[in-house]
Structure formats: C-alpha cells, structure tokens
C-alpha cells in the first residue's frame, strides 16, 4: 500500500500487534510431519522491519521456525509479504486492509476515521477450518477434460528471488467502459490482452500449441466460508492463434471459456480433484520425504498446460475519509515464469507484472495494446531497495573471489606437497577441504538454506566416502576411525 505520507514504524508496529489479535492463524510456523506439512501455532512476536530485500523473497526456510509473513515499510509504502501455504490472495488482502485501517486510525487520531469490519467476527477455529475438506464429496464425478501442452516462455532465468518487476496503473472507469464496449468484464478484457501480448513473442515454429493462462478463482464466491486459510481454485483459459486471428476473436473465446469453466458444477468438480488425491489412503501412507518428490513431479507435469498466470484480486474498499491518506494498493506474486496480478482502489487499478525472465517485451506489448485501445496508463518506476543491480554484482563478485581463493589454496598446497615430498598424497586432502568449503558457500548462496544443516549432511557424506575408500583400497589412512 502506498500512503500519502512517510510511514511511522512505531505506529505500524502497534497496528500490527492489534491486527494479530484478530488473525490468530498468522501466528503459525510451517513444520514437517511424517506424512504431511502442517501449521503449528507459535508464540513468536511479529516485528515490523525496514524493507531491505527484493519483493517476494523467500519467507519459508526449512528447519527455521519463523512466521510465514513479514510486514515492512519503505518511505511511504507499507508492505505485507506472505507465504502461500498460510493463506491465499483474499486472506492476504483482508489482513493488509485491517493493518492499514489500524495504522491510519492510530496515526491520525484527530481525523476520527470510521472503523469498518474487513471480515465478519469469527472464532479462531472458523478462521483455520479446512474448507476444501468441508465441501469435499466423493459423489461428485471427476473432471475428465484433457489439457493440451501449452507454449512455454523460454529464456535465461534470474537467480533466487530476483524478478523483472513492472508496475502499471490504469484508470478503472475508462478500462471498464472499454471492456463493456466489447461486451466483456475487465478480467476477461485483460486476460485477452495478456494472451495477445505473449503471442507476439512466440516464434512461428512454436505457435501450433495454445497459449494458456492459469486464472485463480476465489472459492468463497461459490461455497460460503469464513476460513482465512487457502480456499481457492483455478481455471485455465487459452487460445491457439492463427495468422488471421484478431483481438475480438480472442476476446470472444476467452469470454466463452470463462462462462463455461466458472459454472458452479465444474468449479466443484475441479475443487474435488484437488482434495481427492490428498484423501487417497495410499498417498497418505507414503512418508513426506518420499512424497515431496512425487508432489514436485506432479506440479511440473501440471504446469505443462500453463504459459503464465493472471490473478485479479479485485476491489479494495475503504470509507471516503480514508482517501486523503491512501494513494493506491498494488500486488506482486513470486513466479517461475510470468505472472500478472491486479487489484483496484478508487479509480486506480494497479497491474503488477513479475517475470523470472529478464525481458520485458511482453509487458511492453501489453502497454502498447493499452495505447491502441486508448486507455491511459502510467508505468511506475521501481523503488525497491533490495533490487539494485549493484547489490547483485557485489554478491557475484564476492562468490567469484571466493572460488578463486579455493582454487589458489588447493594449487599452492599441491605445489608445496610436491616440492617437499615429491608426492601429491596430502594435496588431495587439501583439495577436498577447499572443495568442501566451496560447496558449503555455493549451496548457501544458491539454495539459501540452513548452512549448518548443509554442513552436517556434507560432513556425514564425506565420512561415509572416507570409510568406503579405506575399506576398498586397504590404505587405512583416510578415515580416522581406523587410526
């Protein structure tokens, strides 16, 4: 959320403390069970921090018991980042709206800002209920629709949380007027524009496959629920382009697909499909450490039918008195390819593009189409302190220097060993030590995981290899267990 004034961190902390009292679900960490991941309530105080990291940086680090969200601030901006295992877009926006409301009431007591309930009063149990299981029925038939493989975006991807971020602001009224002139909703209109923008970047020899977008669906619109946990599904909307295809053709197809796939019976079939696998007794009996690899393989297989993602969170509403203090709301999502997220407040709709591929051609195509449709827009300049190119270059330079030092130490040890003893026996130990140090640092940098755990596993593996070396060579000089 971008405010009309600089953020006061102390007041923001007070607002966060108030908000946490109403949303106990967020007072949880993600734990590994024997068969599934699960959320565990922890008495950890959520602390407001100044923004330093890139947007959508990793919040969940295995083996570290930390909350699955972070509230930060930078200049006039309040950020709320959340891990998707905790809640979905609707839950996140409800939390942020409550946080912003609490902050503005505390920051401007003389303004007498009205209090509005963002969600109905609920019990902690209702907030944490599993709505998927509540509405699951084994009597609902399977959706047997076969999904064709879609076009995939290609290109070298950025490392870690780094993403190409583009923020575009468009007027709601003019966009709605244009969409209605075509007889469609804003979501259908923007979906068709994104499909066309992607199509322009696909080579001719790859245009036989459809371009498909995953569109998240808020299941609370179909099945009443007070849950603040994940309760969303998705539909896949695509189009196979031909040489004679025009924008109106894509619009008409997308409109019909939305109408067909958002039918309540089909939504229920899809929702049941998400839960059916989890309810399978064979799947439930497989240990998590084995199951997670099949889950990753299944996710990769499922993504074959998707080119990109478009998520429209919808409208954020506040009383008229708040307009003097709120500029706009925006949303970004982490992605392995390309994702567009949108939300609106007042007459401003913010389009947040995130891309793992450092090429903004699709975003430029989209903005060109906005001009062609006579929709004014403003591209916001990125102002994220953790996204500076200088920071990335310094990290890479440090890593390259460390790699050179490891090689240099290994070579020097080899030279000394040969000059003094005319053998290389001890050189291999020095080289192995340098290789271990290099591996620990690189795994820590590229995987961003628990360094101590990586070191422990590495030590265990090396010890086993040493024992095997001694056993099969008969040298009995490598492993200390034999001395």
Model region roles, listed by residue range:
Residues 2, 62-105, 118-122, 128, ...:
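Histidine-centered acyl-transfer/condensation active-site motif
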Residues 77, 86-94, 98-177, 370-382:
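Non-catalytic, low-complexity flexible loops and terminal extensions
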Residues 1-10, 65-78, 153-220:
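Gly/Ser/Thr-rich phosphate-binding loops and adjoining beta-strand/alpha-helix segments
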């Amino acid at each position: 959320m971008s405010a009309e004034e600089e953020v006061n961190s102390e007041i923001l902390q007070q607002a966060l403390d108030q908000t946490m009292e109403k949303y106990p679900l967020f007072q949880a960490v993600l734990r590994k069970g024997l068969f599934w991941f699960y959320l565990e309530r922890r008495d950890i105080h959520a602390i407001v921090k100044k923004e330093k990291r890139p947007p959508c940086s990793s919040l969940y680090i295995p083996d570290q018991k930390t909350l699955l969200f972070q509230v930060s601030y930078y200049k006039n901006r309040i950020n709320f980042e959340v891990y998707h295992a905790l809640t979905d877009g609707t839950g996140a926006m409800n939390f942020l709206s409550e946080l912003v409301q609490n902050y503005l009431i505390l920051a401007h007591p003389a303004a007498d800002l009205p209090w509005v309930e963002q969600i109905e009063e609920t019990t902690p149990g209702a907030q944490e209920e599993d709505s998927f299981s509540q509405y699951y029925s084994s009597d609902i038939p399977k959706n047997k629709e076969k999904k064709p493989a879609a076009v995939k975006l290609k290109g070298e991807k950025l490392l870690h949380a780094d993403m190409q971020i583009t923020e575009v602001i468009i007027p709601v009224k003019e966009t709605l007027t244009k969409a209605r002139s075509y007889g469609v909703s804003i979501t259908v209109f923007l979906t068709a524009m994104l499909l066309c923008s992607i199509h322009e970047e696909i080579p001719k020899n790859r245009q036989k496959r459809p371009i498909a977008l995953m569109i998240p669906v808020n299941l609370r619109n179909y099945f009443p629920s007070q849950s603040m946990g994940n309760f969303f599904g998705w539909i896949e909307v695509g189009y196979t382009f031909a040489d004679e295809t025009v924008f109106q053709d894509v619009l008409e197809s997308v409109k019909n697909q939305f109408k067909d796939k958002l039918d309540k019976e089909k939504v229920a079939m899809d929702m049941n499909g998400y839960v059916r696998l989890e309810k399978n007794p064979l799947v439930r009996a497989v240990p998590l450490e084995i199951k997670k690899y099949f889950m990753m393989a299944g996710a990769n297989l499922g993504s074959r039918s998707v080119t990109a993602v478009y998520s429209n969170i919808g409208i954020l509403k506040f009383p008229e008195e708040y307009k003097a203090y709120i500029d706009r709301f925006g949303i970004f999502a982490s992605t392995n390819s390309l994702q567009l997220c949108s939300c609106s407040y007042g007459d401003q709709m913010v389009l947040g593009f995130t891309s793992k591929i450092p090429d903004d051609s699709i975003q430029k195509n989209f903005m060109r189409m906005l001009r062609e449709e006579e929709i004014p827009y403003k591209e916001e300049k990125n102002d994220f302190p953790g996204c500076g190119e200088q920071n990335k270059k310094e990290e890479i330079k440090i890593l390259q220097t460390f790699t050179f030092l490891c090689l240099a130490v290994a070579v020097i040890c080899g030279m000394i060993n040969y000059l003094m003893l005319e053998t290389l026996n001890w050189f291999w130990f020095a080289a192995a030590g340098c290789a271990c140090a290099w591996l620990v640092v690189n795994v820590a940098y590229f995987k961003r995981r628990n360094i101590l755990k990586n070191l422990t596993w590495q030590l265990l593996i090396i010890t086993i290899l040493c024992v095997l070396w001694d056993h099969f060579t008969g040298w009995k000089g490598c492993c200390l267990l034999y001395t």
